[in-house]
């Protein structure tokens, strides 16, 4: 067990420091903004230091383990730990949240509550990625929903209450299945109930029971990921939320669903995953085509980007269903890659809206001349999203392709069919992304609204965009840096599978 409680500090610090925001002196919003950004920076530096100096990359086992008794009555423990699978998402969470607080600079209404909710969300997300106890995982999963609901319902567009209610109904409905799965896994098997992750991994279940558990967890994670047909909350939510909230939703929240699928469905329930993986493969393939086609018909800029996120999640689903080292590593790389690209696209869409006050693509046009910096960054991230070689999305999608082709679980004809349909999806992606760029930036200036201030991005916005663009290019040029984190853990997970 680790001597110094690094992970406990990393999980508790944001929400504890965030609660002190309400006691800060009333001297305008500047104090609150700087305080929040300093907390996020401190948290990111602490996380980076702990992982650089106390985490061995060549060790696939759980590290920095902390295990404390919490409730003696039913052996509920505060158990945290990090391995190669959760290391990337935790660092991504710290990075995106820090930039999202910087992006939220223009928020002035109830800014104390706004920044507290962002920090509370930060704690819940890091807790979800690092918990090693199933009930603790569930508590952190739920803790993170409340701030998101409040951020959606209080700051956003005209239909924000509708989209926030839809979000909470979907996610709370999914959480019921998650709780049933957690209690089922915890109560089954040994003489005394245990929610310890390591014990549950080594537990064998009857096939019928394992399938029931698998379906419960799958529904919970399918809402978050999202998987068709449980995706309809996402476009509404993204269309109405403030863009700093969108950065956290697209960058981190969706990735929690993918993380849960790998961590619980693949690692705890390998036999059921082997049975369900062909269905996941089919759904992932349909999702790529369906979301790309639907995105093309969206008038609302943020909804179009939201559907592109749904399409990209299809690649993660296919990578997870391929049950190969290459495919699963590609899915994990896509989790990190899309975390950066999705957050950046929503940030740039939001900053464009701040200037021209228009959300519908057919009302825009000719924005490239007055806003060349925003045009350059938006075009660059669009290229990253359509998997241009040299950027992170390309490596992830190629690895997922190779994962399907090399998979021994599937016959040749299904592999050819899935690869062909995925290729069609990859052709549709540039169509909707480039047409979106054309409608916003090219052509004649269509808007003549009196309240539109067309000036280019300032230093703060440029800093946020470039900070996200550097890792996108870095991972594209040298993907081994991210892959080396998870490659040993992926081998460990897949050692339980017959098909490799």
Curated annotation (Swiss-Prot):
Q: Which superkingdom heads the taxonomic lineage of this protein's source?
A: Eukaryota
Q: Name one GO molecular function term.
A: quinone binding
Catalysed transformations (reactions):
a plastoquinone + NADH + (n+1) H(+)(in) = a plastoquinol + NAD(+) + n H(+)(out); a plastoquinone + NADPH + (n+1) H(+)(in) = a plastoquinol + NADP(+) + n H(+)(out)
Cystine crosslinks: none
Could you list the residue ranges that cross the membrane?
4-24, 35-55, 87-107, 113-130, 134-154, 167-187, 207-227, 242-262, 272-292, 305-325, 330-350, 386-406, 416-436, 462-482
Keyword Cytoplasm in record = no
Q: Does the keyword Cell wall biogenesis/degradation apply?
A: no
Coiled-coil annotation reads none
Among the record's GO biological process terms, what is one?
ATP synthesis coupled electron transport
Q: Subcellular localization, per the record?
A: Plastid, Chloroplast thylakoid membrane
Q: Which UniProt keywords apply?
A: Chloroplast, Membrane, NAD, NADP, Plastid, Plastoquinone, Quinone, Thylakoid, Translocase, Transmembrane, Transmembrane helix
EC number, UniProt record:
7.1.1.-
Kindly give the membrane topology term recorded for this protein: Multi-pass membrane protein
Please give the GO cellular component terms listed in this UniProt entry. chloroplast thylakoid membrane
Among the Pfam families in the record, one is Proton_antipo_M
The entry assigns this protein to a family as follows: Belongs to the complex I subunit 4 family.
Q: What is this protein called?
A: NAD(P)H-quinone oxidoreductase chain 4, chloroplastic
């Amino acid at each position: 067990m680790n001597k110094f409680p690094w992970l406990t500090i990393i999980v508790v610090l944001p929400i504890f420091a965030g609660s002190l925001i309400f006691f800060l002196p009333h001297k305008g919003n500047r104090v609150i903004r700087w305080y929040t950004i300093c907390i996020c920076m401190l948290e990111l530096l602490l996380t980076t230091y702990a992982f650089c100096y106390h985490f061995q990359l060549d060790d696939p086992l759980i590290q920095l383990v902390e295990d404390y008794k919490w409730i003696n009555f039913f052996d509920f423990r505060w158990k945290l730990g990090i391995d190669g699978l959760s290391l990337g998402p935790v660092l991504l969470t710290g990075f995106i949240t820090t930039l999202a607080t910087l992006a939220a600079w223009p928020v002035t209404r109830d800014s104390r509550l706004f920044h507290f909710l962002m920090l509370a969300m930060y704690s819940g997300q890091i807790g979800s990625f690092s918990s090693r106890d199933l009930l603790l995982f569930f508590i952190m999963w739920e803790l993170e929903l409340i701030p998101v609901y409040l951020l959606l319902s209080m700051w956003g567009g005209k239909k924000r209450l509708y989209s926030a209610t839809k979000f909470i109904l979907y996610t709370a409905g999914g959480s019921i299945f998650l709780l049933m799965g957690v209690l089922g896994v915890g109560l089954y098997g040994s003489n005394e109930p245990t929610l310890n992750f390591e014990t549950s991994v080594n537990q064998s279940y009857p096939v019928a029971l394992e399938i029931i558990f698998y379906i419960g967890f799958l529904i919970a994670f399918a809402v978050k990921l999202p998987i068709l047909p449980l995706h309809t909350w996402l476009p509404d939510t993204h269309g109405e939320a403030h863009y700093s909230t969108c950065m956290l939703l697209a960058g981190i929240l969706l990735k929690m669903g993918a993380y849960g699928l790998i961590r619980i469905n693949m690692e705890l329930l390998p036999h059921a995953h082997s049975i369900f993986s062909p269905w996941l493969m089919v759904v992932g393939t349909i999702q790529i085509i369906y979301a790309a086609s639907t995105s093309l018909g969206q008038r609302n800029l943020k909804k179009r980007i939201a559907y592109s996120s749904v399409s990209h999640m299809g690649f993660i689903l296919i990578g997870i269903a391929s049950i190969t080292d290459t495919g699963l590593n590609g899915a994990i790389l896509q989790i990190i890659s899309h975390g950066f690209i999705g957050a950046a696209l929503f940030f740039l869409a939001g900053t464009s809206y701040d200037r021209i006050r228009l959300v519908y693509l057919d009302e825009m046009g000719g924005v490239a001349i007055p806003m060349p910096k925003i045009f350059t960054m938006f075009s660059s991230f669009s290229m990253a999203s359509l998997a241009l070689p040299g950027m992170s999305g390309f490596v992830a999608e190629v690895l997922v392709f190779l994962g399907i082709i090399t998979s021994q679980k599937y016959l040749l004809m299904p592999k050819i069919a899935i690869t062909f349909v995925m290729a069609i999806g990859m052709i549709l992606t540039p169509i909707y992304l480039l047409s979106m760029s054309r409608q916003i930036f090219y052509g004649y200036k269509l808007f003549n609204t009196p309240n539109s201030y067309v000036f280019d991005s300032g230093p703060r916005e440029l800093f946020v965009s470039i900070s996200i663009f550097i890792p996108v290019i870095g991972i594209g040029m040298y993907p081994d840096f991210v892959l080396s984190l998870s490659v040993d853990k992926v081998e460990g997970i897949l050692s339980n599978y017959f098909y490799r």
